[in-house]
Amino acid sequence: MLSRSRCVSRAFSRSLSAFQKGNCPLGRRSLPGVSLCQGPGYPDSRKMVINNSSVFSVRFFQTTAVCKNDVITVQTPAFAESVTEGDVRWEKAVGDAVAEDEVVCEIETDKTSVQVPSPANGIIEALLVPDGGKVEGGTPLFTLRKTGAAPAKAKPAEAPATAYKAAPEAPAAPPPPVAPVPTQMPPVPSPSQPPSSKPVSAIKPTAAPPLAEAGAAKGLRSEHREKMNRMRQRIAQRLKEAQNTCAMLTTFNEVDMSNIQEMRARHKDAFLKKHNLKLGFMSAFVKASAFALQEQPVVNAVIDDATKEVVYRDYIDISVAVATPRGLVVPVIRNVETMNYADIERTINELGEKARKNELAIEDMDGGTFTISNGGVFGSLFGTPIINPPQSAILGMHGIFDRPVAVGGKVEVRPMMYVALTYDHRLIDGREAVTFLRKIKAAVEDPRVLLLDL
């Protein structure tokens, strides 16, 4: 009796294990006949068959891994030290299914926008911050229920196949009967009576339709309001602070672009073939600015108003202004003094592409010791840029236009560009500013100055 009980238990465990290993749907299954064989160590045990009449029925439940149904809370990512808070703009709503790394919301800070992706596949259960609400680093944003599988993409509905039966061909219509040939001339029609006319005195003038009001013809005059985004608010605040803090002064000069245009036209194909980059004018001005900043380090310095000290930087990080739909951003090219033209062009292209795609990180815009703004790409002729604090100067580039200039006692038409240097007159004197701008002019007009370190 003991051996039979053990064999039954062993066989039942094996059957149950086999059922559990199979990925069976929810249901009820009955064990078929279970054969119990004589096992070793039990010589007295006999073979026994348990029929289906014996109730060995097991109900199976399909289970899911615990991690698939976990509810997690996603928090605001940490910001840079110079950023304390941001505004939330939701891309998804409650109940939306999201895939891993799919953007759920965007946090707009003073300098850039930070995208918050979903950490896993799941369904959004709750939004913990309203749209447009302010959040700090580590603030809970939303809760997500993991599903373990990416949401299936909706397939386009297929048009139902309709069986069309060929319509039976209609019998051919009989030919029309032949019209009889006329044997007599048709009668000549008599002229009709002219229509009766009214006398002029009987005609009464009709009133002209009233003229439409002048206001209705021009349309309604309306206006609407939009909330300033955080980046625009920060730009306005910083520029006003710069005006209130710095004693800004602007000096001008003009640059003959003939040599740099000739150099670009001669070497642009070889430059593109070797570096896979287009050779532009921006790299020439960035390189010339680094050369001039090394000659005039005070332009690369800044006043620390808290300690009343002048901070001289031994490195050159140049901010390049880039216009985006959200506003003006200034990504930084670091250690420009160690770069060549190809390195500068590559960095400008990478930062510009990230700015247009709104993928700039805060670290890409932190720092900067000098700024270059190129209004010439929009056709600017002249302008005075505003200092980007905490810097002490900014260079403004403008459009290239053919103008008559005196060259060797003769009038020639040359491609000319106006350049402007706005600087903090509290730190930089006029002599240093003019010398700095002339260094840039010399390096751009004749790039050999950079090679010879003149």
UniProtKB/Swiss-Prot annotation:
Residues with the modification N6-lipoyllysine, per the entry, are K111
Looking at the record, which segments are called Disordered? 148-227
The pathway is: Amino-acid degradation; L-lysine degradation via saccharopine pathway; glutaryl-CoA from L-lysine: step 6/6; Carbohydrate metabolism; tricarboxylic acid cycle
What note does UniProt attach to the cofactor annotation? Binds 1 lipoyl cofactor covalently.
What's the EC number here? 2.3.1.61
Positions with biased composition (Low complexity): 149-170, 198-217
Family according to the record: Belongs to the 2-oxoacid dehydrogenase family.
What's the name of the protein? Dihydrolipoyllysine-residue succinyltransferase component of 2-oxoglutarate dehydrogenase complex, mitochondrial
Organism for this UniProt entry:
Rattus norvegicus
Gene of this entry? Dlst
